[in-house]
């Protein structure tokens, strides 16, 4: 109730810029993914798309699976990097619907895929649409989160060792569900595959609402690089599997 009144007008203008003849690019591309996955998996599976804040709703998608009398439901939140505010809340919303069913089938949750070979391959294929040699610098921009979210995740493991720094340099059992660590690992895998040398790229975070969000900030890094004389900066967005307002 606090964010919407201040952002609605600006968001409406931005949506007009990305809207397509087919409609919302997020819905259009997500539907295409659903169709492609159904084709890949075949008739043994039923693939449905459910969305939190637009149609088709999560409840509608699950209701269709209920009518199919499926024996197992695989929930795949389309967030490569795990965060309680995105992946976690989506799973929670799905489970609240499922708990009302008379009979609940087996439920499997795919909570993250930030380092899955198929996901990395897809990002690399997308990047190769560009001549990487033409650019001075590369920015891997992920959606930001409040710092307190990251710290709470660290506290879950009882260590409270998160320093919002070098602790994200390597994935371990104590940070495998840390959003920031997931993002840095995605970047490491991509730059390795794309042969981008050290010093030519940076992992950044966008869409902050205040100065207590995880750093570095995408817009500030791009401004700094421009001041340093970089004239062609290529920005990747590995946190989003479908085009959207972000």
Language model features with spans:
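Active-site-proximal alpha-helix that buttresses catalytic centers in soluble enzyme cores
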Residues: 1-246
């Amino acid at each position: 109730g606090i964010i919407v009144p201040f952002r609605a007008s600006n968001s409406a203008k931005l949506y007009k810029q990305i809207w397509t003849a087919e409609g919302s690019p997020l819905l259009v591309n997500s539907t295409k993914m659903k169709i492609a996955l159904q084709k890949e998996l075949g008739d043994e599976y039923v693939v449905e798309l459910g969305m939190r804040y637009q149609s088709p709703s999560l409840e509608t998608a699950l209701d269709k699976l209920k009518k199919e009398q499926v024996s197992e439901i695989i929930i795949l939140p389309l967030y490569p990097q795990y965060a309680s505010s995105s992946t976690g809340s989506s799973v929670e919303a799905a489970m609240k619907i499922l708990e009302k069913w008379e009979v609940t089938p087996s439920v499997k949750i795919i909570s993250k895929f930030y380092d899955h070979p198929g996901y990395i391959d897809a990002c690399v294929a997308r990047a190769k649409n560009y001549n990487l040699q033409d650019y001075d610098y590369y920015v891997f921009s992920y959606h930001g989160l409040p710092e307190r979210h990251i710290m709470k995740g660290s506290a879950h493991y009882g260590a409270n060792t998160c320093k919002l720094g070098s602790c994200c340099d390597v994935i371990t059992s104590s940070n495998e569900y840390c959003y920031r660590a997931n993002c840095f690992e995605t970047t490491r895998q991509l730059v390795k595959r794309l042969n981008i040398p050290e010093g030519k790229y940076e992992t950044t975070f966008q869409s902050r609402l205040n100065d207590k969000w995880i750093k570095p900030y995408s817009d500030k890094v791009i401004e700094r690089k421009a001041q340093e004389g970089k004239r062609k900066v290529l920005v990747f967005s590995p946190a989003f599997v479908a085009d959207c307002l972000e």
